[in-house]
């Protein structure tokens, strides 16, 4: 399935039904009064979070979404039927904004959570509403109100507790595939991963924690270079960042600095997010090389740096223990 995490849609709520002018015409009611009914309420356009959806693909070509109009009023003071609401299912983690003002209308993070994004118009009044002591036979009635119509920006931000970040080819996809049942595309060249991958990693209690492998972070990603800018939003909701460094790259220290710079430039508090630092690909270095690199990065981070091999699974148990501890599990 194609991964689409942004969409622009137009929504139009239903208009209210018109009220009517009518009078009682029963044979034995010679002074029949006004009996025109009110129009029905227009239907709303509603978004609902659905945890079975993972993409906004359904909205890529579905541009105008409308709800039903209310029905006009009837005689004998009968109110017209209300228009049906249109309920649209979106993935959990969908943020909704007004396109013109950029104002956030809501953030649908929980299964079943609903958000009315366009309210239906109110029904018009029938002439029965205007009966008074001074006017016993009013003919006045009103039309229904027009339903709201907006252009909306939908933006999906994945719901993961742990975000795996690092330069292309740092081993993020291999790590998430080893830790979970996720099966991302893996190969020995940059940008193998073109979309975020989610994997559920089991805690000792048996419960699952969602990890996200974020692709495409390179120098300048926060400014729109490469793929990273499109996907940095997916780590905004994470509680912990797993910063993966390729220990066998040409310049691991510079790689580390590059990711730091991108997190700082992007903002949204990512640089201050709890982070666990990991040197991957231990199997490609000798003990002396890995020790020197470890010392350099620990001096820069002032924190423990984990040494692992996602391929041989060395150090993964210790790494997971640190993750669970950071999450408070």
From Swiss-Prot:
Its cofactor is Mg(2+). It is found in: Cytoplasm. GO terms for cellular component: cytoplasm. The keyword Methyltransferase does not apply. GO terms for molecular function: ATP binding; GTP binding; GTPase activity; magnesium ion binding. Pfam families: GTP1_OBG (PF01018), MMR_HSR1 (PF01926). Keywords: ATP-binding, Cytoplasm, GTP-binding, Hydrolase, Magnesium, Metal-binding, Nucleotide-binding. Residues 1-159 form the Obg domain. It is an enzyme of class 3 (hydrolase). Mg(2+) binds at residues 173, 193. Its EC number is 3.6.5.-. An essential GTPase which binds GTP, GDP and possibly (p)ppGpp with moderate affinity, with high nucleotide exchange rates and a fairly low GTP hydrolysis rate. Plays a role in control of the cell cycle, stress response, ribosome biogenesis and in those bacteria that undergo differentiation, in morphogenesis control. This is GTPase Obg. It comes from Prochlorococcus marinus (strain NATL2A). The lineage of its organism: Bacteria, Bacillati, Cyanobacteriota, Cyanophyceae, Synechococcales.
